[in-house]
Amino acid sequence: MSIFITLIAALIVFSAVIAIHEFGHFTVAKLCGIQVNEFSIGMGPALWKKIYKGTQYSLRALPVGGYVALEGEESPESQQAEAARDEREAEDENPVPPEQRTGIPLNEAPVWQRVLVMVAGAFMNFVLGFVVLVILVAAQEGAITSKTIYSIENDALCGQTGLQAGDEIVAVNGRRCFVANDILYELVRTEAYRARFTVKRDGQKVELPDVQFDTWQDEDGQTHMTLGFTVYGIKKTPLNVLKEAWNSTLYYGRIAFISLADLVRGRESINNLSGPVGIVTAIGQAASYGWQDLLELLALITIKLGVFNLLPFPALDGGKVVFLIIEGVTGHAVPEKLQGTLTIAAFALLFGLMLFATYNDIIRLVTGVM
């Protein structure tokens, strides 16, 4: 796969994910009557800009994402801050003249509206993921894969330890299975090649506490698991496509959350973190396999970004929501100085993690170990 195609594919993916996120903030801010000073596609010098209904719309030279500038996003608390803000406006940092502004500053909007603005970006990431998955499910060949067992191989260990043909797999190890991939994901996480299944059998839920699976070893001595059963296909109707896409969105969202939880709990090594270099490499590989693999990776990235942004961590949208909830409960905003200190510390930590992940990416590229 050429470097040019990899870069183009990466630009498309990153731009789509970031632009849709910022569009979410922009749309809800507009609906809530909050002043949006600028909505930009791309970064860097402006190639084109126009003020329309109180907002400057701009197209910038670097086709990487975009941003939304909201009036009052950093609310002043002191006379010094107010003076600095007046100085910025005097220098025309705000692209919209005062007489053309149509909304109120963000910090003057009700708390609930500010919360909606903060979560709207992540929400649109989930929407993008869902739309992409609808396209993928509709375009796939054959039927939709179900979670209902069609047949079990002769003498398969899973059949001897509880599973039967006709069982609909509801959960594995206590985690609900939204799609067939959930079953595989949980079994891969099961190091002992055995798991607790919940199935629906003859209309009743049945607990199977110790379903075991056959294993085999390759010539390198690596142990692999044999599933030992096949499942029914589901007819591809518009409703079933939408249901499968919705359940797949939940599946990807849970993968993102579990991955983060595993990292915090130490189950997943921090050395496995991927940074920008690793993500671009993965995008290039997906693009080389075809448009469907690229779209699937786009869905995974945008849903992961949505989950990550909602974490209650300063510098992320979820952290801002926590500050707003505190303000709503106590009636007093968290001091701007404290917010700023926590946000700077959080940015420093995230930047450090990104550098560490980028270092890991480069080492993997050099050594060929992915």
Cite the ranges covered by each PLM segment.
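Small-residue-rich helix-interface/hinge motifs
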Residues: 3-92, 311-330
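PDZ peptide-recognition modules
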Residues: 4, 78-120, 124-273, 370
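Alpha-helical transmembrane segments of integral membrane proteins
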Residues: 5-13, 300, 346-353
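Membrane-interacting alpha-helical segments
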Residues: 40, 65, 239-265, 277-280, ...
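Membrane interface segments of multi-pass transport proteins and intramembrane proteases
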Residues: 47-51, 148-152, 325-341, 368
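Transmembrane alpha-helix interface/packing and boundary motifs in multi-pass membrane proteins
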Residues: 262-266, 302-316
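Small-residue-enriched transmembrane helix starts and helix-helix packing motifs
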Residues: 291-307
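Juxtamembrane boundary at the C-terminal end of a transmembrane helix
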Residues: 356-370
